[in-house]
């Protein structure tokens, strides 16, 4: 009998699968793909719609010590951006998150991901000027990539795929979050890159 890989998916609405169901979130679909390939995966997805880095630090990171994950995915930042976080504050929060992951799960493989370009969503205009929002998303993603690299985490750049999905209008009725098909495409790409 194989020892299960312990997969902890940290994040916000894009991780829990808002716009579909948690069972169709990208971590759940990714775990299913790996199971189909014979891997034994125990997934924990504590992500919550609306979470920012403060919430992740307070509510999700304590699970590291209990779960002792062998794999961690990290996708966080959209709500920091919406709440007006500065780039410096976002960076310092990511440093704290990566340090805590390394301290509490030193042997885990960490895969950091970008946030999608939600400025392309039908509801994107509700958050301000679309060009300004798109530029901030790109800067936040650059910071996330830099801090992932600095921490020794893997950066999987799904942003080109995510942006193409946005341009094609791959949104559920909420007009903001990715569709079930979009999340599944993220999972398939991750399965190709991060096996």
Task: Give residue ranges: language-model regions.
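Serine-esterase "nucleophile elbow" of acetyl-processing enzymes
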Residues: 1-49, 59-68, 184
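Short, flexible loop segments at the rims of nucleotide/cofactor-binding pockets, characterized by
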Residues: 48-53, 132-133
């Amino acid at each position: 009998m194989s020892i299960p890989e312990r997969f902890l998916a940290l994040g916000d609405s894009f991780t829990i699968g808002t716009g579909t169901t948690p069972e169709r979130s990208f971590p759940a679909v990714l775990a299913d793909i790996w199971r189909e390939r014979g891997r034994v995966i125990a997934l924990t997805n504590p992500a919550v719609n609306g979470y920012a880095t403060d919430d992740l630090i307070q509510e999700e990171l304590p699970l590291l010590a209990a779960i002792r994950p062998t794999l961690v995915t990290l996708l966080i930042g959209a709500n920091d951006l919406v709440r007006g976080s500065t780039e410096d504050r976002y960076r310092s929060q990511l440093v704290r998150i990566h340090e805590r992951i390394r301290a509490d799960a030193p042997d885990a493989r960490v895969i950091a991901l970008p946030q999608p370009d939600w400025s392309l969503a039908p509801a994107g205009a509700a958050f301000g000027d679309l060009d300004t929002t798109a530029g901030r998303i790109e800067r936040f993603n650059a910071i996330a990539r830099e801090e992932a690299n600095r921490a020794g985490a893997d950066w999987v750049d799904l942003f080109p795929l995510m942006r193409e999905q946005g341009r094609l209008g791959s949104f559920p009725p909420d007009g903001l979050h990715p569709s079930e098909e979009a999340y599944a495409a993220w999972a398939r790409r991750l399965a190709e890159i991060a096996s």
